[in-house]
């Protein structure tokens, strides 16, 4: 309600109050306003204490699930999954971490090192030629995004299944 009241408006209200109320009665009015604020705060605190003593146990029963819900809502998805499925042990999810996977020595790295040392591929490796790799010399090459039918791109964006193989 008063969140958009700035210091300029407060100063204007103070000046209007000084003019309307007068400098003689303004200090007494400020003391009365201060006493009213203090009385309201003590009344609110007393009401809170009465509610806590009368309904404290019932409120505690409601507060526990609400605190658990607030804790779950503040968790990240990874933390929620590890807590629900793995009882908080996140070591299982480390096997899916790409940084840790790439940091480990993989079979591909070992193969590249062996090829670099010997200059040849291992004997058990065989080269497989796919039918898509064969080029028919009588056929004109297709470029992605173009069709041989007047240069218009096909509806699928110019790529075929052979581009993916």
From Swiss-Prot:
> Molecular function (GO) terms listed?
protein transmembrane transporter activity
The cellular component terms of Gene Ontology attached to this UniProt record, alphabetical and capped at eight, are: TAT protein transport complex
UniProt lists compositionally biased (Basic and acidic residues) regions at 123-136
Known function: Part of the twin-arginine translocation (Tat) system that transports large folded proteins containing a characteristic twin-arginine motif in their signal peptide across membranes. Together with TatC, TatB is part of a receptor directly interacting with Tat signal peptides. TatB may form an oligomeric binding site that transiently accommodates folded Tat precursor proteins before their translocation.
Q: How does it assemble?
A: The Tat system comprises two distinct complexes: a TatABC complex, containing multiple copies of TatA, TatB and TatC subunits, and a separate TatA complex, containing only TatA subunits. Substrates initially bind to the TatABC complex, which probably triggers association of the separate TatA complex to form the active translocon.
Give the family per the record: Belongs to the TatB family.
**Could you tell me what this protein is called?**
Sec-independent protein translocase protein TatB
Name the source organism. Answer: Corynebacterium efficiens (strain DSM 44549 / YS-314 / AJ 12310 / JCM 11189 / NBRC 100395)
């Amino acid at each position: 309600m008063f969140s958009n009241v700035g210091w300029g408006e407060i100063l204007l209200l103070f000046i209007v109050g000084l003019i309307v109320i007068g400098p003689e009665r303004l200090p007494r009015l400020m003391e009365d306003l201060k006493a009213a604020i203090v009385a309201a705060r003590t009344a609110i605190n007393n009401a809170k204490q009465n509610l806590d003593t009368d309904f404290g146990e019932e409120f505690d029963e409601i507060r526990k699930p609400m605190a658990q819900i607030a804790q779950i809502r503040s968790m990240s998805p990874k933390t929620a999954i590890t807590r629900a499925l793995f009882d908080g042990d996140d070591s299982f999810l480390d096997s899916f971490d790409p940084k840790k996977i790439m940091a480990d020595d993989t079979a591909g790295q070992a193969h590249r090192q062996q090829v670099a040392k010997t200059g040849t591929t291992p004997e058990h490796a065989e080269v497989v030629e796919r039918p898509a790799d064969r080029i028919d010399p009588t056929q004109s090459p297709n470029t992605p995004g173009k069709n041989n039918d007047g240069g218009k791109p096909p509806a699928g964006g110019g790529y075929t299944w052979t581009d993916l193989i």
